[in-house]
C-alpha cells in the first residue's frame, strides 16, 4: 500500500505499513482519500530533523503550532508503537502528537535517523520515492526562527495506490 503526496516541490511516494499499524494506517489513508491533506502547507521545517504538515485549512489553527487536527473518528487515538518500526533513516513517516495517545491527523517526515523519537511517535510509513529529490528541496527551504518555511509550499493532492479501505464502511 502506498500514497503519493503531490507537493509544490515535487512528489513524495510513501509506503504505508497497513499490517503493522492498522488503526494509524486506516486513519491516514481515509484522510488522504477524503482530500483532507489537499492544499495544506508544511508548517514546520527543521533541516537535519524533520518536516511537518500543517492543518490550518481544517482546524482553524492560525498559530501554525501543529497542535490541531482530528482523526477520522473525530478525536485523538492511541499510539501503535512497534519495536520493529524505528526512526532509523531519512524518510520515516510518523504521527505528530502532543504526548502519549494523542494522535490526530498531523504527521511528519524525518530528514535523518532519529532514534530518540522511537517509542514516542507512531511510525506508519517510509518514503520510497522522492527522498533524494523532493525532500532535499524541502530541507533547503529557508526558515524563520520558529522553523516556519519562508517560502510556502503545499501538498496539492494525494494519490492512493491500491486502497484496502475503499470497500470498508467508514
Swiss-Prot record:
Gene3D superfamilies membership: Cyclophilin-like (2.40.100.10)
Domain of life: Eukaryota
Documented EC number(s): 5.2.1.8
UniProtKB keywords: Isomerase, Rotamase
InterPro entries: Cyclophilin-like_dom_sf, Cyclophilin-type_PPIase, Cyclophilin-type_PPIase_dom, Cyclophilin_A-like
Catalytic activity, as annotated: [protein]-peptidylproline (omega=180) = [protein]-peptidylproline (omega=0)
Alphabetical list of CDD domains matching this protein: Cyclophilin_PPIL3_like
TM spans (from-to): none
Start and end residues of each PPIase cyclophilin-type domain: 1-160
An annotated Gene Ontology molecular function: peptidyl-prolyl cis-trans isomerase activity
Pfam families (UniProt xref): Pro_isomerase
Record-annotated disulphide pairs: none
Cellular component terms (Gene Ontology): catalytic step 2 spliceosome
Listed PANTHER family: PEPTIDYL-PROLYL CIS-TRANS ISOMERASE-LIKE 3, PEPTIDYL-PROLYL CIS-TRANS ISOMERASE-RELATED
Family designation: Belongs to the cyclophilin-type PPIase family. PPIL3 subfamily.
Chain's role: PPIases accelerate the folding of proteins. It catalyzes the cis-trans isomerization of proline imidic peptide bonds in oligopeptides.
Record-given protein name: Peptidyl-prolyl cis-trans isomerase-like 3
Organism the protein comes from: Rhizopus delemar (strain RA 99-880 / ATCC MYA-4621 / FGSC 9543 / NRRL 43880) (Mucormycosis agent)
Gene name for this UniProt entry: cyp4
Amino acid at each position: 500500500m502506498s500514497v503519493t503526496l503531490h507537493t509544490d516541490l515535487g512528489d513524495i511516494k510513501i509506503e504505508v505499513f497497513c499490517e503493522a499499524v492498522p488503526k494509524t494506517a486506516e486513519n491516514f489513508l481515509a484522510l488522504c482519500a477524503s482530500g483532507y491533506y489537499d492544499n495544506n502547507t508544511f508548517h514546520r521545517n527543521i533541516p537535519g530533523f524533520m518536516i511537518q504538515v500543517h492543518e490550518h485549512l481544517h482546524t482553524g489553527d492560525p498559530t501554525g503550532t501543529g497542535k490541531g487536527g482530528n482523526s477520522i473518528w473525530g478525536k485523538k487515538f492511541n499510539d501503535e508503537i512497534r519495536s520493529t518500526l524505528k526512526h532509523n533513516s531519512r524518510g520515516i513517516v510518523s504521527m505528530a502528537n502532543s504526548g502519549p495517545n494523542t494522535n490526530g491527523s498531523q504527521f511528519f517526515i524525518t530528514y535523518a535517523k532519529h532514534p530518540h523519537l522511537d517509542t514516542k511517535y507512531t511510525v506508519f510509513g517510509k518514503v520510497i520515492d522522492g527522498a533524494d529529490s523532493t525532500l532535499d528541496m524541502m530541507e533547503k527551504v529557508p526558515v524563520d526562527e520558529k522553523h516556519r518555511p519562508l517560502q510556502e509550499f503545499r501538498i496539492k493532492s494525494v494519490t492512493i495506490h491500491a486502497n484496502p479501505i475503499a470497500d470498508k464502511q467508514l
